[in-house]
Amino acid sequence: MLSSVMAPLWACILVAAGILATDTHHPQDSALYHLSKQLLQKYHKEVRPVYNWTKATTVYLDLFVHAILDVDAENQILKTSVWYQEVWNDEFLSWNSSMFDEIREISLPLSAIWAPDIIINEFVDIERYPDLPYVYVNSSGTIENYKPIQVVSACSLETYAFPFDVQNCSLTFKSILHTVEDVDLAFLRSPEDIQHDKKAFLNDSEWELLSVSSTYSILQSSAGGFAQIQFNVVMRRHPLVYVVSLLIPSIFLMLVDLGSFYLPPNCRARIVFKTSVLVGYTVFRVNMSNQVPRSVGSTPLIGHFFTICMAFLVLSLAKSIVLVKFLHDEQRGGQEQPFLCLRGDTDADRPRVEPRAQRAVVTESSLYGEHLAQPGTLKEVWSQLQSISNYLQTQDQTDQQEAEWLVLLSRFDRLLFQSYLFMLGIYTITLCSLWALWGGV
């Protein structure tokens, strides 16, 4: 009775065990596991992966500029973010895909295989990039290695044409140890495709990517020839923010100074106005000095622009001071007590009666008050009247000379203004020509 009950139970247990055994998979049963084990079991990453040691391993390079992070003109350093790709053939990592469940591509750890020792010659800082520990290997032994790199490289930055400057920085890739007989370099894409490819570039920074030209060359040294590929990153600065914050305010201040020439030469407000413009320009120049890049090699053209504009403002103020000085000296030479250098501002421009004339008027009043009591008073009154008449004639001559002198100074002021305007125009044309020549505008 018991045996009849246990028999079906044992049958169920055996069926369940068979099903579990069928559904359980072990890594040893995976074709991918067998393939990776077979490829790496006897692999030596210290040996260049060729069967014929006289055959060079060709490494194909490609580069995508992702972003321009920083341009340090003072330290001559460029920081860029690039996508870098290496492709080479490893003869020790090929297989027949039909023997491994039609697997045509596999990912392997980069640390377990041979990799070319490619470096960037212009590197000046430790590269920082995400750790991508795997590479793709296909059945023919072709390996693809992708590297997003943040490159901090040395670059000869020319800021003379700032803010319309165009920079050309190079990134040179070469093997640090292997000569061209062992490791050769080549382009993964044609240089024409690399030059005009901007699809990966983030064009929302201060710089615009113009092109990425590339050249192949062999560097000869005492140890032999080394293959190298140089990528020239050509970029142009977006000048709008600097034009608005630096150039336009400076141009406005220069135009305001030109407008001050329409004030009369003998107007006191003219010198005060020009002095205020000069002080305002000096404060503006000090506040904006941090926006101009500093370079040891050369001073940016905009620095010369600020200096010459300030020199023009000083020249304009000095010219007005000289004109007022001429007018002041002329008035001092015309009479004993000088007039003020500016007309119409005080009571000094009204005719003043000398003490002698004042006494004459008083005497005349007193004489008439006494009804001409003394017989000699008529002669004295006549003498005083003649003195007043002579003074008025002298005053008229002085006013006429002053008017003629003002006309002469106005003509001289107009001549100086035209000369000032001519020099300013020549300077503006020269500055724009230099910016266009150096900046490639």
From Swiss-Prot:
Residues 381-413 are annotated as: HA-stretch. It comes from the Eukaryota. The chain crosses the membrane at residues 239-259, 269-286, 304-324, 415-435. It is found in: Postsynaptic cell membrane; Cell membrane. Residues 1-21 form the signal peptide. Pfam families: Neur_chan_LBD, Neur_chan_memb. GO terms for molecular function: excitatory extracellular ligand-gated monoatomic ion channel activity; serotonin-gated monoatomic cation channel activity; transmitter-gated monoatomic ion channel activity involved in regulation of postsynaptic membrane potential. GO terms for biological process: chemical synaptic transmission; inorganic cation transmembrane transport; monoatomic ion transmembrane transport; regulation of membrane potential; serotonin receptor signaling pathway; serotonin-gated cation-selective signaling pathway. Residues 260-268, 325-414 are cytoplasmic. Keywords: Cell membrane, Disulfide bond, Glycoprotein, Ion channel, Ion transport, Ligand-gated ion channel, Membrane, Postsynaptic cell membrane, Receptor, Signal, Synapse, Transmembrane, Transmembrane helix, Transport. Coiled coil: none annotated. N-glycosylation required for membrane localization. Disulfide bonds join C155-C169. InterPro entries: 5HT3_rcpt, 5HT3_rcpt_B, LGIC_TM_5-HT3, Neur_chan_lig-bd, Neur_chan_lig-bd_sf, Neur_channel, Neuro-gated_channel_TM_sf, Neuro_actylchol_rec. GO terms for cellular component: cell surface; neuron projection; plasma membrane; postsynaptic membrane; serotonin-activated cation-selective channel complex; synapse; transmembrane transporter complex. Expressed in the brain cortex, in the caudate nucleus, the hippocampus, the thalamus and the amygdala. Detected in the kidney and testis as well as in monocytes of the spleen, small and large intestine, uterus, prostate, ovary and placenta. Changing N96S: Reduced molecular weight. Very little expression in the cell membrane. It is a multi-pass membrane protein. Gene3D superfamilies: Neurotransmitter-gated ion-channel ligand-binding domain, Neurotransmitter-gated ion-channel transmembrane domain. Residues 22-238, 287-303, 436-441 are extracellular. Changing N138S: Reduced molecular weight. Very little expression in the cell membrane. Forms serotonin (5-hydroxytryptamine/5-HT3)-activated cation-selective channel complexes, which when activated cause fast, depolarizing responses in neurons. Belongs to the ligand-gated ion channel (TC 1.A.9) family. 5-hydroxytryptamine receptor (TC 1.A.9.2) subfamily. HTR3B sub-subfamily. The HA-stretch region of HTR3B seems to confer increased conductance to HTR3A/HTR3B heteromers compared to that of HTR3A homomers. Forms homopentameric as well as heteropentameric serotonin-activated cation-selective channel complexes with HTR3A. The homomeric complex is not functional. Heteropentameric complexes display properties which resemble that of neuronal serotonin-activated channels in vivo. This is 5-hydroxytryptamine receptor 3B. It comes from Homo sapiens (Human).
